Amino acid sequence: MGEPIVEWLNQQQDNMVELLRDLVDIDSNSFNKAGVDLVGARLTAFFDDNEIPHETIPLEEYGNAIRAVVSGGDGNQPILLCGHRDTVFPTGEVEKRPFSIADGKAFGPGVADMKPGLVINAFILAAFHKFGGHPNPLVGLFTGCLLYTSPSPRDLH
């Protein structure tokens, strides 16, 4: 199971950078629900393109949550891949310093925070889905906000 997944992931670097560029180039301050939800929409488009089952869990004040599940075997111990879609950067930061790569390093709002982790989690889900899943379910939980919605995840089960 592992070798084809690793080979496929190794071939996805350009696609990973493209998804990262898309996510970084969206202003998604914690208090900008529309922007955070736009990051979520880009991720759900990725899940749709890769035929990964997912659902959006609406939250009123901050960004909605997204749950994507890749099943496979009959294991009953889910493996959680999680990350938040917001950044601390104010709306307008993307215009000042959009995603760029220089000397092999990525720059832009969120590249040193969770946005690369969102890309990694999305591609891990895609890889396992493509190759038949994992013995235990893989659950991707993409929350709207790291700090301000801490009571809200109780509603996500």
PLM-predicted stretches and their roles:
Residues 2-109, 129-136:
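Acidic/His- and Gly-rich active-site-bordering loop/insert found
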Residues 31, 113, 147:
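Glycine-/small-residue-rich active-site loops that bind phosphorylated ligands and cofactors
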Residues 34, 76, 115-116, 150:
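Residues that form or flank phosphate/diphosphate-binding pockets in enzymes
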Residues 85, 142-147:
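Acidic, glycine-rich active-site loops and adjacent beta-strand->loop/helix elements
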Residues 110-125:
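Active-site alpha-helical elements of protease catalytic centers
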Residues 124-131, 152:
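Active-site catalytic microenvironments for nucleophilic, acid-base chemistry
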Residues 138-140:
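Hydrophobic/aromatic residues located in beta-strands of well-ordered beta-sheets
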Residues 148-157:
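Single conserved hydrophobic/aromatic residue that forms the stacking wall/gate
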